[in-house]
Amino acid sequence: MLEVTTTYAVLDLETTGSTYDNGDRIIQIGVAFVQNGQVVDQFATDIFPNQEIPREITKLTGITNEQVKRAPKFEAVAEFLWQKLSNTVIVAHNIGFDYKFLDKSFQAHGYPAMTHDRVDTVEMVRTLFPTADSYKLGEFCLAHGIQLENAHTAIDDAVATAHILIMCQEKVATMPVELFAQLQPFLHYFIGQTGDYMALWFKDHKGPKRPYEYIAPFVLNPKSANFHIFPAGFGTKEASYLQAGDLKVIEANHGVSLAPLQKIMVKDVAPFFYEQATTSTDTNKRPKYAFLTANAGVVKSLAYVVSALSADDTASQQTGAKSGVNNGQTQVVISTSTVILQHQFLDKTVQLATNLLGKPLKTVILKGQNHFIQLTKLQKYIQQLKQHPESALKRDVLISVALFVWLHETETGDLHELNPGLNNELYWQNVNRQSKGSRNDEIQRWADYAFYERHVTEAKSADIVILNHAYFVYHYQDLIDQAILTEEAKVIIDECHQLPVTVHQQQIKTFQSKEVEETLTAMERTVHRLMDKVVTNNVKIQAVDKLYHVEKNLQEAWGNLDRFIDQISDRFQTKSYYQRHTAQKSYYIANDYYLVANWRESAQKAVTAMSKMVSPLKVIARQLYQMGILSKRAYQQILGQLNQYDYAIQIWLETTKSSENYYADLQVNLGKHNVQVTIDRKLYTSQSHLAAIFQAIPCKMLLVSASLEIVRSKNMIQSLFGIEDFAWYSFMEDSYTQQFVQGRNHQVRGYYLKDFLSIDKYNEDQAAMVIADLVETLWTNRKTMRKIQVFFQSRSLMRATQFEMKQRMTRSDYGNLIVQNNQRNLDRLARQYEDSSRAILFAVASFQEGVHLNAKTDAFVLTRLPFSAPDTPDELAKQDYLKSLGDNYFDDVALPDMLMNLTQIFGRMAASGSQDAIFISLDKRLEKAAYADQIADVMPDALNMQTVKLQELKRID
């Protein structure tokens, strides 16, 4: 039972604004009083603020000037409220706002400063409920079954917050003793007295509700994920089938039916997977590779997964294996472009396939180790926080507390489960800097809680393994060695047009002068530390002479690094000055120039000298340890640091090498007091690397995209993928027919605007105003414009338009504007858009490739044709490379890439547009450019473009 002597006054205020000192005042007060885990009393009143309530506050809260006109002033209720709050603990959802605002209101009327204990529910839910999608009051309540009918009504918000408080009390009281013991050293970091009361609640410990396993310092959930997705019903007695070549494939079962287009796909794709692969010219056999192109949103993923699994089932039956029983090997391996799409595929497509087939499917998501919690690294980092509390940031401490709680709950260790706010980049950089053991060491130390290693092991016997392209490219040989990519497996590459980009990114090697300087400084400290040990202890050992060579290399490294900075400054001083006045951020360095650049040679000499220091320092440290001069812990620490330095140095050595296959992307920042330089060494073309990957994989591969039609029409399959012999399945026209025509009684309306020039004729500020004019006009049509998507090609223009909208919109309306900016969690952005009753989404055109939106959108705005900027280092490198081949950059790369991006936009529009959705292009090159006929080829036939005035859009119904 929770202690009964304390009364918690759970407070919520509604105010005219956020700052008391700026003249804002209270307009409504709600207090819910909690004792013994129950709401025992309430206090609620409107307050007359002696001023007009801003219109946006009325829209947000529903509180009007008329409503508060006869309400008491604050001073009229102050004494009663002061007495009600005496001897209570003040609780609020964001205590910093409500407590301070109320305190200043009291003091303004002669009361002393409040000295109540304070408890904040925001910090508690962030740490105690680490997997919650949102910590906003309304969204958290909705997700956890707490009634909140009138959000932004003070008493309703206060009562809801009271129930959150009770949830937190219960969760703390049911924690395992070992878990709370790990949290206790960090409780003083919580705001006010929040941590003190958490400790008080734990005194009434009830014992954990779930079993747990304690492997110090972590309390872990012994329930392991079994990785099976279960169907709505078992068996195929009621199933209906279609014939696909020699295969019988289920087309309807347990409430799931293949759509007509999916059936057509299955009839082509299932035989491809079933028949023996060959790369010969034998016409009776299917090639090893096939390409499938169909529009986004037709659920082609269900068609190809069912095709692959059905082919495997049929083969199993013919060899005598029991249908539906995995033979101990992976059946289907799917790679998609992003981690978000991996999880969407699992949640949506695999569940549909499971229902259709009437059997469970073991499905494992594989992604990089850093996507899973690594307990060895986390343990070391938390130990650092405990040992050095003076330098520990509150942010890092509270994230660590949340992770302790989460580890008691998670079955997978997948960081995707966590609220995005816990995926702080700086925090995880600090964690990932810690060393860890080998794969076998991790398994031996943590057993089933070596989460990444467990996923790899489980993948070997999975029905479906879902990868992302980065993992596929980096680990394909590991997947072959681990018997996941076998001859019997069936590989599907979704969003395959992104695969060459992934290979290109995976091959990038980076040299950052700041990191090199910091590493060299740290190595110098290590040299001096070891030298001090040698001198202080008058050591005469064989390794002493190595210190001379280390010191010599140290000086050589510093000299060459300084020379590198000076040479960069001399070479790029003028260019960097002009760069301040342009949008250029970096320089393209062609391979022939990179080869002879004196600054590259200096950088290479610097890191070469650093590399020569590592091995001697290890030898010296080992001998000092063997002599008892260094403790085991100190020796292991030095060894771990040197290994980290060596890993970075090898990358820098690779970066500073010259090769005809690589160019450099050079970024120079000439500050007043220092110069920072970044060199990214990049591939000119990824074709040979990608071809090597495909040749190594022993099984059939289906490559899928909505953007392949234009690639094939330009004969670019071989240049992009290195594949010559392949099957081709195109369903683009069938896709558009299904999405745009079926179920509609009219063509899709598309518009150009008479009022404006084509957007490419304006500068950025002018373009932002044009876009804002259009969006503002659409937004005023509240009857038909509920959801609006605006596609940008430039983030800079997107930010400029966002600023323009902020100047024009009310605070309430501006709250409906969702902007991609630099958010890493696109999934959360998509959910925010989908869950809103009205919303405007500003996103770069590529946003749609990483996220499948289910929300029905009423207007799609194309601000500018999705061409890549031609003067970036990457595009300049393409121009150089194509020129060397005698090809044309615009015709062979820029235009096809733009058409592929445009196809993606049209596909998403077809997939997520409402019944009466409209399309607006502010770029008139769509119809007037010399290449307009090629654009017309990728536009849906059902899209009917016409020219109108801006004001006519207000009357669209």
Protein language model features and the residues they cover:
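Acidic two-metal-ion nuclease catalytic site recognized across multiple nuclease folds
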Residues: 1-2, 167-242
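Conserved non-catalytic scaffold segment of RNase H-like nuclease domains
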Residues: 2-117, 130-152
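Acidic, Mg2+-coordinating catalytic module of metal-dependent nucleases/exonucleases
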Residues: 86-106, 130-132, 136-198, 919-921
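Conserved pre-motif I regulatory segment
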Residues: 232-293
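Conserved coupling segment at the C-terminus of the helicase ATP-binding
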Residues: 233-235, 245-250, 284-295, 368-429, ...
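A substrate-engagement module of RecA-like helicase motors
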Residues: 316-462
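Conserved motor-coupling elements within RecA-like helicase/translocase cores
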Residues: 456-462, 813-841
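Conserved RecA-like P-loop NTPase helicase motor core
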Residues: 755-763, 825-923
